[in-house]
Curated annotation (Swiss-Prot):
<protein>
    <recommendedName>
        <fullName>Formate--tetrahydrofolate ligase</fullName>
        <ecNumber>6.3.4.3</ecNumber>
    </recommendedName>
</protein>
<dbReference type="InterPro" id="IPR027417">
    <property type="entry name" value="P-loop_NTPase"/>
</dbReference>
<dbReference type="InterPro" id="IPR000559">
    <property type="entry name" value="Formate_THF_ligase"/>
</dbReference>
<keyword id="KW-0547">Nucleotide-binding</keyword>
<keyword id="KW-0436">Ligase</keyword>
<dbReference type="GO" id="GO:0004329">
    <property type="term" value="F:formate-tetrahydrofolate ligase activity"/>
</dbReference>
<keyword id="KW-0067">ATP-binding</keyword>
<keyword id="KW-0554">One-carbon metabolism</keyword>
<dbReference type="GO" id="GO:0005524">
    <property type="term" value="F:ATP binding"/>
</dbReference>
<feature type="binding site">
    <location>
        <begin position="68"/>
        <end position="75"/>
    </location>
    <ligand>
        <name>ATP</name>
    </ligand>
</feature>
<dbReference type="InterPro" id="IPR020628">
    <property type="entry name" value="Formate_THF_ligase_CS"/>
</dbReference>
<comment type="pathway">
    <text>One-carbon metabolism; tetrahydrofolate interconversion.</text>
</comment>
<comment type="similarity">
    <text>Belongs to the formate--tetrahydrofolate ligase family.</text>
</comment>
<dbReference type="Pfam" id="PF01268">
    <property type="entry name" value="FTHFS"/>
</dbReference>
<dbReference type="GO" id="GO:0035999">
    <property type="term" value="P:tetrahydrofolate interconversion"/>
</dbReference>
Length: 559
């Protein structure tokens, strides 16, 4: 039985020079910018050259059921499946993934580079500083906030109201103490005193913009369109009104270029951008996915959290910005997560419990049927854990197949690409089937109708209840003429409802809309439901307690 940790496996794997990985996808030396021997950015010369290639590969979206707090191995499946298609089926394959946020690495969830023998490497670099994209974003976020505060202090000819500034500062750390602060305290020499707050870097609008921008000009335009706040005369003020878009774009110009790394089995992987799926759109950058589509025959990408969050947002929003729609959808399921959805105690998830599995199956059933309603072929992959019994695995596969869906059991974590060759064959076969894409809502639908259609069709809510604050914000959005934008619903990842403890597949509940936020630069409206936080906190035993580094700089304890 394998007892090696993820980081031990990664550190004991021989990497290929990143130049050789680039050659696998026909990138010339002048089309990459090296970050040491194992990481690179694809240059603008490379990106512009790739765009001329008319070829478009098959796009495979990997999503999942509602997760347990520890996650269900979606990234592991994405990486392992990509390795299997490339190295076992010998097809030209690329993986496109989000880059991890550093905050959760030291918190509860840990890193986001896969696990076991299905990882992207160098895992410690990717999980920590990588190529500096997150630091560039944090600098851009806080520079913009500082410029706005300085504008109010120095001139403020537009009479921007310091109490109606919508921008948040950013830091890529889980720190609950920064959710609400007061700045400019003391004398006026320290600035204008007003309340402010921090969001984790990946929750900031600039992260969404980085992931949606198609080039530097588009990046600059989107930054200029960010709504800063309102004047004392109730007029909206945008970044372009203050003239800061050029400086902020300059800070992000290098971060906009996608990063190239490899898997343990040397499959090329583009890792770029990382918005959360519960509070943003939850997909890697458009530049990364489009670049991958032009470079390979098969591209695997994932959508954050469950199919009700990242999956829905990918289908209804992200795919509108890509060069093509998904050709197939993979829904990742685990035995333990379905037992959790049956309200089984986390202390007993490793014990065989067929009745709990059957009860929890309702959650998977809804997710896979929701994805099928988009008109794209769907397959379920069961991520096998050591604690799963054969009876549980076979029962789950039977339940899925009885509902009319393809299903395979995979063990990429323990076996690498050999842990799911038949699954890879079936996924490739599915991409060749005809699809008839049907979004949940139409672009011309009103904001209320878009929210209602997602709530009814995806969540199975009975009704929607708007807070007084949300009603006021909706009226402001309509007054500005921005109510034609897509909606991104911010919701707990653990439930179809806005309450994380209501598990399974609930019906006929009320979805509570707490507030709405116009993300004008990104081009969507965030609809906050329940108690959603954009600045996480740390748990009682943070992962940081288990992380260390020796005198040779070798890091241990990352997972």
């Amino acid at each position: 039985m394998n007892l090696k940790s993820d980081i031990e496996i990664a550190q004991n794997t021989k990497e290929l020079p990143i130049k050789e990985i680039a050659q696998k996808i026909d990138l010339r030396p002048e089309e990459i910018e090296l970050y040491g021997n194992d990481k690179a950015k694809i240059s603008w010369k490379g990106i512009n050259c790739i765009k001329k290639n008319q070829k478009l590969g098959k796009l495979i979206l990997v999503t999942s059921i509602s997760p347990t707090p520890a996650g269900e191995g979606k990234s592991t499946i994405t990486i392992g499946l990509g390795d299997a298609i490339r190295n076992q089926l010998h097809k030209n394959t690329l993986i496109a993934l989000r880059e991890p946020s550093m905050g959760p690495v030291f918190g509860l969830k840990g890193g986001a580079t896969g696990g076991g023998y299905a990882q992207i490497i160098p895992m410690e670099d990717i999980n920590l500083h990588f190529t500096g994209d997150m630091h560039a974003l944090t600098s851009a976020i806080d520079t913009l906030a500082a410029l706005v505060d300085n504008y109010i202090y120095q001139d403020n000819s537009l009479e921007l109201d310091p109490n109606r500034i919508l921008l948040k500062r950013g830091i890529d750390v889980n720190d609950r103490t920064l959710r609400k602060i007061t700045i400019g305290q003391g004398s006026r020499f320290n600035g204008i005193e007003h309340e402010a707050s921090f969001a984790i870097t990946v929750a900031n609008e600039l992260m969404a913009i980085l992931c949606l921008a198609t080039d530097i000009n588009d990046l600059k335009k989107r930054i200029g369109n960010i709504l800063v706040g309102f004047s004392v005369k109730d007029e909206p003020v945008y970044v372009k009104d203050l003239g800061f878009e050029g400086a902020i774009a300059a800070l992000l110009s290098t971060a906009l270029k996608p990063n190239l790394v490899q898997t343990l089995e040397h499959t090329p992987a583009i890792v770029h951008g990382g918005p959360f799926a519960n509070i943003a759109h939850g997909a890697n950058s458009v530049i990364a996915t489009n670049t991958a589509l032009h470079l390979s025959d098969y591209v695997l990408t994932e959508a954050g959290f469950g199919a009700d969050l990242g999956g829905q947002k990918f289908m209804d929003f992200v795919s509108n910005h890509l060069d093509k729609r998904p050709d197939a959808v993979v829904v990742v399921a685990t035995v333990r997560a379905l037992k959790y959805q049956a309200e089984e105690s986390t202390d007993h998830l490793d014990e065989e419990n067929i009745p709990a599995l059957e009860k929890g199956f309702a959650n998977l059933k809804r997710h896979m049927e929701n994805m099928a309603h988009y008109g794209v072929p769907v397959i379920v992959l069961i991520n096998k854990f050591a604690s799963d019994t054969d009876q549980e695995l076979n029962k789950l596969k039977e339940l899925v197949q009885d509902d009319g869906f393809e299903c395979e059991i995979v063990s990429y974590h323990d076996e690498g690409s050999k842990g799911g060759i038949q699954a890879a064959e079936k996924v490739v076969e599915l991409t060749g089937k005809a699809s008839d894409f049907k979004p949940v809502y139409k672009p011309e639908d009103s904001v209320e109708d878009k929210i209602a259609k997602i709530a009814h069709k995806i969540y199975h809510a009975k009704d929607i209840e708007y807070s007084d604050t949300a009603k006021k914000q909706l009226a402001e959005i309509k007054k500005m003429g921005k109510d034609e934008l897509p909606v991104i619903i911010a919701k707990t990842q653990y439930s179809f409802t806005d309450k994380k403890k209501i598990l399974g597949a609930p019906e006929d509940f009320i979805l509570h809309v707490k507030d709405l936020a116009l993300k004008n630069g990104a081009g969507f409206i965030v609809v906050a439901t329940g108690s959603i936080l954009d600045m996480p906190g740390l748990p009682k035993h943070p992962a940081a307690l288990d992380i260390d580094v020796d005198n040779n700089g070798k890091i241990s304890g990352l997972f």
